[in-house]
Amino acid sequence: MTTQLDALRNMTVVVADTGDIDAIKKYQPQDATTNPSLILSASSLPQYAPLIDEAIAYAKAKSADKTQQLIDAEDKLAVNIGLEILKIVPGRISTEVDARLSYDTQATVEKARKLIALYNEAGISNDRILIKIASTWQGIRAAEILEKEGINCNLTLLFSEAQARACAEAGVYLISPFVGRILDWYKANSDKKEYAPAEDPGVISVTKIYNYYKQYGYNTVVMGASFRNVGEITELAGCDRLTIAPALLKELQENSTALVRKLEFKGEVQAKPQPLTESQFYWQHNSDPMAVEKLADGIRKFAIDQEKLEKMLLEKF
């Protein structure tokens, strides 16, 4: 009997949205994605204690400055967790740049180069890593620089068509348009509290972005992210990639209802439009209150979890 997870794998690259090694072993995804929140939750698991100890020892050996030690330890911990995941997944790991750098192009570029260097020192080549960066104008510019250096990027916290378009025009390797957080916003800001999967505003957003990319022949990979229910996932069957939390992977594995491909572009590829200017980007992005609020909110939440991670590391120094 074919499960929905098996059926989905036949039309979409399945990625695990977790830092939990045991969950990754269980569901055998192609790739895995992490973020500061997932690194924080993974760090509380007992099997990760040696990775934390190693990161702290590395940081202490590298610098005598306490502030620098903390920065080095959190970078090394994120990479250590990534290295463990890469022992299991055949594809790529996404490791995120500190969200507090989201509005600083040069600092983002420097952090990305540092993370890549840590992976390279451990024998991992660039083609197995994606550097996650928030889809701010500054983050997109950083990704444009990094892509030219052979460092592939995953542009995250993507909520608007303007963000998606700017990423494609910058030659970004992959984007992570969010589904569930868009649904959250509409539930909180409208009278409608329930949405059928096909009417889900997050599903509609990713579908539009997918079709736009295919219509204009952009090579940027579309990886739907942030799911609240299995219905959102099945409505996006056929998307290039989907990154899915273990609880929803479990539901897909336990369901054998037939899965129908929903995303597939069959039209003719058209000539690409002129790239958005910075002012056009901000006008279009800021015309969507949901996108403005969710991008800022996402950056804040990741920054808060980064600070919690720092506090946890400091207690172990």
From Swiss-Prot:
The keyword ATP-binding does not apply. PROSITE patterns: TRANSALDOLASE_1, TRANSALDOLASE_2. Its main location: cytoplasm. It is found in: Cytoplasm. GO terms for molecular function: transaldolase activity. Disulfide bonds: none annotated. Its EC number is 2.2.1.2. The keyword Repeat does not apply. It catalyses: D-sedoheptulose 7-phosphate + D-glyceraldehyde 3-phosphate = D-erythrose 4-phosphate + beta-D-fructose 6-phosphate. It is an enzyme of class 2 (transferase). Keywords: Cytoplasm, Pentose shunt, Schiff base, Transferase. GO terms for biological process: carbohydrate metabolic process; pentose-phosphate shunt. It comes from the Bacteria. The active site is at K132 (schiff-base intermediate with substrate). Pathway: Carbohydrate degradation; pentose phosphate pathway; D-glyceraldehyde 3-phosphate and beta-D-fructose 6-phosphate from D-ribose 5-phosphate and D-xylulose 5-phosphate (non-oxidative stage): step 2/3. Transaldolase is important for the balance of metabolites in the pentose-phosphate pathway. NCBIfam families: PRK12346.1 (NF009001), talAB (TIGR00874). Homodimer. This is Transaldolase.
